[in-house]
Design a protein with these regions (language model features):
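Divalent metal-dependent phosphate-bond-processing catalytic cores, especially two-metal-ion Mg2+/Mn2+ enzymes
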Residues: 2-72, 93-118, 162, 179-266
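Glycine-rich, flexible beta-strand/loop modules in the N-terminal catalytic cores of phosphate-handling
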Residues: 68-75, 82-92
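Short coil-to-beta-strand
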Residues: 76-84, 119-128
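Short amphipathic alpha-helical interaction patches enriched in hydrophobic/aromatic residues
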Residues: 91, 113, 134-138, 157, ...
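Active-site metal-coordination segments of metallo-dependent hydrolases
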Residues: 94-103, 138-150, 163-164
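Buried hydrophobic packing segments
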Residues: 106-109, 149, 153, 157
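Acidic/histidine metal-binding catalytic segments
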Residues: 118-124, 161-173
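His-Asp-centered metal-binding catalytic motifs of divalent-metal-dependent phosphohydrolases/nucleases
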Residues: 121-140, 145, 149, 153, ...
Length: 266
């Protein structure tokens, strides 16, 4: 497995930034998908919909994976570092709906990584969670919103004196987090758990892998408000701004309906 991971992620262990959804790909294309890329993502979306259907059965039956009940989100502490403080300031610039989503993404993503037994860079994951959707509230025609999120993250990293390689690893994870079908081998833990944590909150995906007590604690700390409605509006605005992008495809495939049907009250 280690050899396979190195071959796909590169000798440095970092994901290939030129892969679909990566930092350099997003900069080069502004997020516009080719016909072949759309076909690949459609297949990944179909797999995700099937997994969601099976997962909802697990959720209804209360079937948790081994170790899920042993994870306690109350023990998760924000890192104390200059980068974390920069990310917190950047997070506070966002609309209230995105601020709450950002912190819930952090908690849900960490819980999933703990259940999966996956090591995360806790500082980078915290900061990525807080800033991953920074650009979504101000969609730019023809330019994927993850670029603005990545740029804000790179500014945080520069202000905190973070090395370029480490900063670009985080920016890459933010760019790829909206790509259906991410994998640990190709996309690395940061990008995967940014997506998976965000999707627990956004559409209830993998909620069946999080203990109910942890879900309740996350919502107690960061209430959802009217998040379903607000998220659907943001997704539709991004899809209108970049119709050939990933959110354009996701909206056409019915993800707003999945958001409305998520197992949350709002």
């Amino acid at each position: 497995m280690a050899a396979a991971q190195e071959s796909q992620a590169g000798a440095s262990g970092a994901p290939d930034p030129d892969r679909m959804g990566g930092l350099r790909w997003t900069r080069r294309t502004n997020g516009k998908l080719t016909a072949g890329e759309r076909r690949r993502l459609l297949a990944a979306i179909a797999v995700g919909q099937w997994e969601n259907a099976l997962g909802r059965v697990k959720l209804a039956l209360g079937r948790l994976p081994a170790g899920a009940a042993d994870v306690d989100v109350k023990t998760f502490e924000p890192p104390d570092s200059p980068l974390a403080r920069e990310a917190e300031q950047a997070c506070a610039e966002q609309p209230a709906a995105i601020i709450g989503h950002s912190y819930r993404t952090w908690l849900f993503g960490r819980a999933l990584a703990a259940v999966d037994g996956t090591d995360l860079d806790l500082e980078l994951f915290y900061c990525g969670s807080l800033v991953h959707d920074h650009g979504i509230a101000q969609p730019t025609p023809g330019r994927d919103f993850t670029l603005a999120s990545a740029e804000r993250t790179l500014a945080c990293a520069a202000a905190a004196g973070v090395a370029d390689e480490r900063a670009e690893l985080l920016a890459d994870a933010i760019c790829v987090h909206t790509t259906p079908g991410v994998s640990l081998d190709a996309d690395g833990p940061l990008g995967c758990y940014l997506q998976w944590g965000a999707m627990v909150d956004g559409a209830g995906l993998r909620m069946w892998d999080v203990a109910p007590a942890n879900v309740s604690e996350v919502l107690r700390r960061h209430p959802r408000g009217d998040f379903k409605r607000e998220l659907v509006e943001l997704m539709r605005a991004e899809a209108a701004a970049v119709p050939a992008g990933r959110f354009g495809l996701l909206v056409r495939c019915g993800v707003p309906l999945a958001v409305r049907m998520a197992p949350f009250d709002a």
